[in-house]
Structure formats: structure tokens, C-alpha cells
Amino acid sequence: ERVLPLEDRDCATVVERAFKKRGVDVFTGVQLEKAEVHKQGVHLTFKDSKGVTHQLDVEKVLSAVGRAPNTEDLGLDRGGVITERGFIVVDEHLRTNVKGIYAIGDCAGHQLLAHKAAHEGIVCVERIAGQGHGGIDYRNVPNCTYCQPEVASVGVTEEQAKEAGMDFQVGKFPWAGIGRAVAAGHVDGFIKVIRDRRY
């Protein structure tokens, strides 16, 4: 259990360390038991990942527990389109199980990102026009997390490379080695490259 569970473990470590350095208390794997709104803010009662109960008074609460697809009123069941947890199931060419029906964007799952949806739209229209040349490899969709320090990634994480049994090398360069980062006073972080040894 860590902050940024979908990002590379090294990234999560740097972000958590930066948060703690700024005095941010970090709790992961918590289960919220009660949130009581008061004039001064919100009183929270929650259990941490070890089952220990904590109470915390905060000004505001931001709940970031994911997003749900908005596909309920599309009549997908009447058309026989298969969904999984509300997302429309598609192949690498954005085709559903029903001939002639495609799906792109958030309703089709994967990363819920605007630039991913735009690319899916292009791939889908090319396929419909008979000019499709390939599908989408979701490993090549860039991601970012807006925090300080910022996190950006594309491709597989080190953990994913290990799980896939890839023969890979890791290259890592400290952010503090970049003059602009030093000049800006933002030296936390690194650049990390996971390279398949075949290439």
C-alpha cells in the first residue's frame, strides 16, 4: 500500500517523501468510518491498513476513489453490447462484440484520459473508413499526476516489466543533475527508463 499505486514504486517513494518533508501526514489503505462536518471543517474517523483507528480534523476532504462509466442509459443491453463493471468491452480496434458498434473514451475503459480518447477516435474512424492500420497499445499512452513533485510516465513500470517476465535494463538519472531543476529549486525526483534488452 502506497501513494500513487499505479505508478512506478520509485516514483511513489519520492512523492511520499516530498509530502512528508512538507509536513503532510500520509495514510494509505485506510477505511473511512465517519466524516462529521463542522463549522471549522471535517472531523474524520478512519482505520489505517493495520486496523488502528485514527481521528483527524481537517479543513476539507477530497475523495479520489476513481471514476465510474456513464453508460447506464445508452441502451447497450437492448443492443446486446457486452459491458464489464459498466465499461463497454472493446478489442484493440475499439470494436464491441456487436458488428458495426464501436466505443471510445471513458466509456471504453483503460486510462480515462482525454488524449487517449482523442487517439481512440482517430483509430476508430480510420477503421470504419477502411483505412485502419493497427490497434491501440495502451502501454504507449502518456500519464501524469499533478502533484509536487510532478509524475509523468509512459510505457511499463519496473514492476510490470518483472511481472511480464521481460528481459530488461533500468537506467536512472537524478533530477538534481539537471541545471534547470536546480535553478528552479525543484530537485526531488529522477528520470527512469525501462529498456527491453532486445532493442
Task: List each model region and its residues.
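Rossmann-like dinucleotide-binding cores of NAD(P)H-dependent redox enzymes
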Residues: 1-54, 111-118, 124-160
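General small-molecule cofactor/ligand-binding pocket signal
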Residues: 25-27, 102, 169-171
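A short, glycine/Asx- and small/polar-enriched loop/turn
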Residues: 37-42, 98, 184-189
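Short acidic-glycine loop/turn motifs at beta-strand connectors
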Residues: 38-39, 84, 196-199
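Short acidic, glycine-rich loop/turn motifs
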Residues: 46-51, 92, 195-197
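C-terminal catalytic lobe of FAD-dependent flavoproteins
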Residues: 54-80, 153-199
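FAD-site-proximal beta/loop scaffold in flavoenzymes
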Residues: 55-130
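Glycine-rich phosphate/pyrophosphate-binding beta-alpha loops
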Residues: 106-113, 147, 176-184
